[in-house]
């Protein structure tokens, strides 16, 4: 008997170097190792690149694509939808250090999630799913977390911080498939857009 959750993966890692590193992974699984089960198998492709042209400067980029044909989504009460799911995630960062006094960090995490071809189901008292006649809309989720942080050492144990943050989450009931357009939505209509300056002294 197969376990409720199972899967396998193939990984390729580049040589460990200070200048350049890369990581590739393909994963096929049903459910999560320490999470909920799922109706079917999902495919997850991940690639990550690290580039450090100088000792005090590093660039990092990660991209992941997850696909699942029978993604189960709870809507309300005992009403569920089964969708074709795609999730595209991009994480980019830049870290720079100017001696002992200056530190600049930039990080952006963007998620584009699409749920298409929805089918409606209801569950009975023992958890079985039964297909019903109902209308469910496909939807698109956009998520952004962007931050730039600068730190300056004024005196020993005294620091100036300048932080800019922007982001949010937007859900639209549409079939937009352009990753560029999906990523742009929370940037153009942010739920958070803050600029902070503070001084901290450690006693």
Language-model features: locations:
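Exposed, low-structure sequence patches enriched in small/polar residues
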Residues: 1-203
């Amino acid at each position: 008997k197969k376990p409720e959750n199972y899967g396998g993966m193939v990984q390729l890692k580049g040589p460990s170097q200070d200048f350049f590193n890369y990581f590739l992974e393909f994963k096929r699984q049903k459910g999560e190792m320490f999470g909920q089960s799922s109706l079917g198998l999902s495919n997850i492709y991940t690639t990550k690149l690290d580039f450090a042209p100088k000792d005090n400067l590093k660039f990092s980029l990660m991209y992941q694509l997850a696909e699942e044909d029978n993604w189960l989504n709870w809507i309300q009460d005992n009403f569920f939808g089964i969708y074709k799911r795609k999730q595209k995630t991009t994480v980019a960062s830049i870290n720079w250090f100017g001696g002992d006094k200056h530190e600049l960090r930039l990080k952006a995490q963007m998620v584009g999630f699409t749920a298409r071809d929805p089918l409606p189901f209801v569950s009975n008292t023992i958890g079985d799913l039964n297909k019903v006649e109902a209308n469910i809309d496909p939807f698109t989720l956009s998520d952004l977390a962007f931050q730039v942080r600068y730190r300056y050492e004024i005196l020993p144990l005294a620091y100036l911080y300048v932080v800019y943050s922007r982001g949010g989450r937007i859900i639209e009931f549409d079939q937009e498939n352009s990753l560029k357009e999906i990523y742009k939505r929370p940037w153009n209509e942010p739920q958070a857009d803050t600029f902070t300056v503070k001084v901290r002294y450690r006693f």
